[in-house]
């Protein structure tokens, strides 16, 4: 079953190639696979086609900078970005079936970190093979320091990842395919190498936080990533977690590409299926993966101004006043024409004031723009100074880092030179020690050969002595026998015949025994010859192995040989003492027994005749046979014991020496292999140091060129900044001059304004004087009219209404004046200072009305109309004559009302609040009429 390829776009606009193996039936699980460093997802076709056949869907992607995905080859900016890429791929998995994370080598490191960090996307299981927790070969401190330094300066700069293709698998076909694969590379960036080593070693410390079902697979012969680190991580994962550790024998790094790959794939599939069944049993209806999306809602609140709304009722309330005065406007056209010149004057002032305000606003706007510009220029200048300062600090840091790198490289060079000198000294000392050991070895071998020869000669002498003693014993026995024969010659013929027979048998037995002993001696000599040959062969092998042994092994050998020699010497002395004691005891016993027997036989011969001699002869023969049998058995047993002990001791010594020689040879071999590995590592380090030195020189050259270019750039920018500074200073001087002129102009306007305010104050004083005169005249006129009215009322009560109608008609000019004053109201709104002066007059009216608080409360009920009347009287001031008369009459009426003592009038004003307004209007009309008559007079 083949795979399909598609593309996904990451958050930083990189393209990831996604390879998918889809089963023909509904998937029972999904797997997100993360490949290792330098390879790509296409190398797992034979593994995941088996997964798809078993109903498991697999999504494998080429990491950024790998395979056919985009990005710098061998570069990923950070662990977090790599985990985001994994999350992007994992989000494509089905959510209704169990989801597993599978990572190999460096991908295994990412898979473990993903399960530790992405708690909201908890998978059903995690499978990691040969994970990168620690490298199999420890990275040197020089490499780490150089990598950390250069990784911070040039994170995307790529170097070789030092992976040996021959160590990925023991299958040569896999190695050849790996070498010929064009999508495989051996690159890694300095920045990625830095964070990869740092974050991988953190996994052992983070292992107690791991809570996902785990299958950890590693090969014991892995030479790329460390199997012991996997064991440590596994041991630190809590025991409550479902975890499995599988260590494969006789395999290299890629366990899925070894000869037993089918067995490996079957093992993985069985583990996954078991976890699927567990997931079904635990929560058959729950989804394994859940994605949570957060939505943020932003609410914008708009607040409207209440000022406009509050002003609407005022406008509406003033409408009826205008409508009521419409008929009057038509009748009072001459009055309107007379008051036209006044609004023109007011319009010009309003226009001037408006222009002045516009100029002030424009000047304020220009000043604001100038200040904003100055602030922006100041901020830009500070930013530029900060940038120059930062660049200078960066340059200084770069130079400092380069100096530190140079110092580190120099220190590393000195350390390597010292190590080389130490190595030469060590080799010299080892050569001297080897020569001394060889000489000592030859001396000890000579001594051992001499001791062995002496021991051999001693044993041969002892054997010859034993044979000689046995021979002498037999000869003595033979002499005794002859003596007995002489004594027995006197015996009977039958006894003689029996005796001869017995002697013949004894001679035959002795001959047989002699031949047996000679045969055994021959066999012993042959055995010694074979043992000597074996010893010589062992000695030759021993010399060959010992030639490769180390000084330490030689010292151990010397100690063991000394102990063996001491033990052999002690054993030898013990055996010699025991043999001598046994021989002496046996000799004394035989002599004693022979003497006793001879004495007994002699006594028996003397005492007895022939029977005694026969009995003695029989007893002597029996004794002889017994003694011969005992002596033969004792000699044979002693001989066998000595031979067995000697053979066992020789065999034990031989095995001991062979074991020691083999151990020493193995130790020497391991030492030589270690020295060879150290030599290769040293050569590798020297080559890397040379490359690092070359890279350093290149970087220094580039840094110098960049520094020079940056310096020239900074000088050019400084010159530009100087020009900009001069330009800004010129603009600032021009702006300061303009500001100075503006301030002088404002000062002139302020003085003009103060002059106008002084004139307005004088006009106000004049107005108050005129108002006082008008009030006095109005009061006099009012008293006169009241007197006339009282007289008329007393004369004829029936004609009261006609004057009222006439008075109503007289009021029409007043309404006409109200209409004329509408444009003045608009002028009043513009001339805000005048309104303030009008408001100041209100306390004067209140002081006038202190005696009648009821009337003051009555006036509060209609504040809008009252304010309108105040504005009308205020804006008129001393302009239209009829308006001034109206205000003077109104104030006169108020003063008259305050001083009036008539109870009826006071009661009417208190109970009917609106009538005072009508009366005021009537009084105004009367005042105007009287004033008009006075004017005509």
UniProtKB/Swiss-Prot annotation:
PANTHER family linked: PHOSPHOLIPASE-RELATED (PTHR11614)
GO CC, one annotated term: membrane
Name of the protein: Uncharacterized abhydrolase domain-containing protein DDB_G0269086
Coiled coil: 345-802
Active-site annotation: 292 (charge relay system)
Example of a GO MF term: lipase activity
EC number from the UniProt entry: 3.-.-.-
Compositionally biased tracts (Acidic residues): 887-897
Coiled coil found in the keyword field: yes
Stored Gene3D superfamilies: alpha/beta hydrolase
Pfam families: Hydrolase_4 (PF12146)
Residue stretches of biased makeup (Basic residues): 925-937
Tree of life domain: Eukaryota
Keyword vocabulary terms for this entry: Acetylation, Coiled coil, Hydrolase
Region feature (Disordered): 281-937
Family: Belongs to the AB hydrolase superfamily.
Comp. bias intervals (Low complexity): 290-308, 898-924
Bias-annotated ranges (Basic and acidic residues): 309-402, 411-431, 469-489, 512-532, 600-615, 667-687, 738-758, 780-872
Residues with the N-acetylthreonine modification: 2
């Amino acid at each position: 079953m083949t795979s399909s390829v598609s593309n996904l776009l990451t958050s930083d606009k990189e393209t990831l190639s996604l390879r998918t193996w889809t089963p023909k039936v509904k998937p029972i699980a999904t797997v997100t696979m993360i490949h290792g460093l330098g390879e790509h997802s296409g190398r797992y076709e034979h593994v995941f086609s088996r997964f798809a056949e078993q109903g498991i869907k697999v999504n494998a992607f080429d990491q950024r900078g790998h395979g056919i995905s985009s990005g710098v080859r061998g570069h990923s900016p950070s662990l977090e970005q790599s985990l985001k890429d994994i999350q992007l791929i994992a989000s494509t998995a089905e959510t209704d079936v169990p989801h597993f994370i599978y990572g190999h080598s460096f991908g295994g490191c990412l898979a473990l970190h993903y399960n530790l960090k992405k708690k909201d996307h908890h998978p059903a299981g995690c499978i990691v093979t040969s994970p990168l927790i620690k490298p199999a070969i420890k990275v040197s401190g020089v490499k780490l320091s150089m990598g950390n330094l250069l990784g911070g300066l040039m994170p995307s700069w790529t170097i070789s990842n030092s992976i040996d293709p021959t160590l990925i698998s023991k299958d040569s076909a896999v190695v050849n395919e790996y070498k010929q694969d064009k999508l495989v590379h051996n690159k890694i960036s300095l920045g990625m190498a830095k964070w990869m080593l740092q974050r991988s070693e953190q996994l052992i410390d983070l292992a107690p936080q791991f809570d996902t079902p785990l299958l950890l697979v590693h090969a014991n012969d892995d030479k790329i990533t460390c199997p012991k680190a996997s064991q440590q991580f596994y041991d630190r994962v809590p025991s409550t977690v479902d975890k499995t550790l599988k260590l494969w024998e006789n395999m290299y790094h890629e366990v899925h590409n070894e000869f037993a790959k089918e067995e490996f794939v079957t093992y993985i599939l069985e583990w996954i299926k078991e976890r699927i069944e567990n997931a079904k049993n635990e929560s058959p209806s729950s989804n394994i993966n859940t994605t949570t999306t957060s939505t943020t809602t932003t609410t914008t609140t708009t607040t409207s101004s209440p000022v406009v709304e509050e002003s609407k009722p005022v406008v509406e309330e003033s409408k009826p006043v205008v409508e009521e005065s419409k008929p009057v406007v038509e009748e009072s056209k001459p009055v309107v024409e007379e008051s036209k010149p006044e609004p023109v004057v007011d319009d010009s002032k309003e226009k001037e004031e408006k222009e002045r305000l516009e100029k002030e606003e424009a000047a304020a706007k220009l000043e604001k723009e100038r200040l904003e510009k100055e602030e922006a220029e100041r901020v830009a200048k500070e930013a530029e100074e900060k940038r120059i300062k930062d660049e200078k600090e960066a340059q200084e840091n770069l130079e400092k880092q380069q100096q530190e790198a140079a110092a580190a490289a120099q220190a590393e060079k000195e350390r390597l030179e010292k190590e080389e000198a130490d190595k030469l000294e060590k080799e010299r000392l080892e050569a001297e020690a080897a020569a001394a050991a060889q000489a000592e070895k030859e001396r000890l071998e000579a001594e051992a050969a001499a001791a062995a020869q002496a021991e051999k000669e001693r044993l041969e002498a002892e054997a010859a002595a034993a044979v000689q003693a046995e021979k002498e014993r037999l000869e003595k026995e033979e002499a005794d026998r002859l003596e007995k024969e002489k004594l027995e010659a006197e015996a009977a013929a039958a006894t003689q015949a029996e005796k001869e027979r017995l002697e013949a048998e004894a001679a035959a037995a002795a001959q047989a025994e002699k031949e047996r002993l000679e045969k055994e001696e021959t066999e012993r000599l042959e055995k010694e010859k074979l043992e000597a040959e074996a010893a010589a062969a062992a000695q030759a092998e021993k010399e060959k192995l010992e030639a490769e042994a180390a000084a330490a092994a030689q010292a151990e050998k010397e100690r063991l040989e000394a102990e063996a020699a001491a033990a052999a010497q002690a054993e030898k002395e013990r055996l010699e003492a025991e043999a001598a004691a046994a021989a002496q005891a046996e000799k004394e016993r035989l002599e004693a027994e022979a003497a006793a027997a001879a004495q007994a036989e002699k006594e028996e011969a003397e005492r007895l005749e022939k029977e005694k001699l026969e009995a003695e002869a029989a007893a002597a023969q029996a004794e002889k046979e017994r003694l011969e049998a005992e002596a033969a058995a004792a000699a044979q047993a002693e001989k066998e014991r000595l031979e067995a002990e000697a053979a066992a001791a020789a065999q034990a010594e031989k095995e001991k020496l062979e074991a020691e020689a083999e151990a020493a040879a193995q130790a020497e071999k391991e030492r030589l292999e270690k020295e060879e590995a150290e030599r290769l590592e040293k050569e590798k380090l020297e080559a890397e140091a040379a490359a690092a030195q070359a890279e350093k020189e290149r970087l220094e050259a580039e840094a110098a060129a960049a520094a020079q270019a940056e310096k020239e750039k900074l000088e050019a920018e400084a010159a530009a900044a100087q020009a900009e500074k001069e330009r800004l200073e010129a603009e600032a001087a021009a702006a300061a001059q303009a500001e100075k002129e503006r301030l002088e102009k404002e000062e002139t306007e302020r003085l003009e304004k103060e002059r106008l305010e002084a004139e307005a104050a004088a006009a106000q004083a004049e107005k108050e004087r005129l108002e006082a005169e008008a009030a006095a005249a109005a009061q006099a006129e009012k008293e006169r009219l009241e007197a006339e009215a009282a007289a008329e009322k007393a004369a004829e009560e029936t004609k009261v209404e006609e004057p009222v109608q006439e008075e109503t008609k007289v009021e029409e000019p007043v309404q006409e004046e109200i209409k004329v004053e509408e444009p003045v109201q608009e002028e009043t709104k513009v001339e805000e200072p005048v309104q303030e002066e009008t408001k100041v007059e209100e306390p004067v009216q209140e002081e006038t009305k202190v005696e009648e608080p009821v009337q003051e409360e009555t006036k509060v009920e209609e504040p809008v109309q009252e304010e309108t009347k105040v504005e009308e009287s205020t804006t008129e001031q001393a302009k239209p004559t009829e308006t001034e008369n109206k205000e003077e009459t109104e104030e006169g009426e108020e003063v008259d009302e305050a001083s009036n003592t008539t109870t009826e009038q006071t009661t009417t004003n208190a109970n009917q609040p609106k009538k005072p307004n009508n009366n005021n209007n009537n009084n105004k009309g009367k005042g105007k009429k009287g004033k008009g008559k006075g004017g005509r007079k």
